[in-house]
Amino acid sequence: MNMKKKILTMICVTVMVFALALPCFAESSTKIISTYTENLGNGISAVVTIEETTVQGRTAKTYSKSENYYSGGTYIGRAVLTATFSYNGLTSSATGASGSGIGSNGWSYGGQSTWTSGKSAYLSATLSNGGTNIGVSISLSCDANGNVK
């Protein structure tokens, strides 16, 4: 009976050690690559963030590029391009693209299209308010080592 308790205690301690150690090795699934502000002219600016959202082995990655738009300091909308790239150290290619967007504070978002060409992915759309239209254009390119710009 005493031996059974020792074995059970050792099993419980081992399970607890592994259960407590797992969170230490957990990684965030999203990594911010860069954030910067772009002046688009006519009082419009965009806060741009590029994130690595998924790593699929050593030869494919998914990135997103989001742009939050402001007119005179007032938030007017957001657009996001998400793209998947494959690469092998010699070449790269964009294998898929999707997008989303929203208008805010009287602005509407529409006319969105996404596509890929070679090693790049693209999003095109329009933010509109009355007779004012702002062209939204986002692109992501990947080099042969899986780095984006």
Predicted features along the sequence, with ranges:
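N-terminal prepro-regions of secreted/extracellular proteins
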Residues: M1-G73
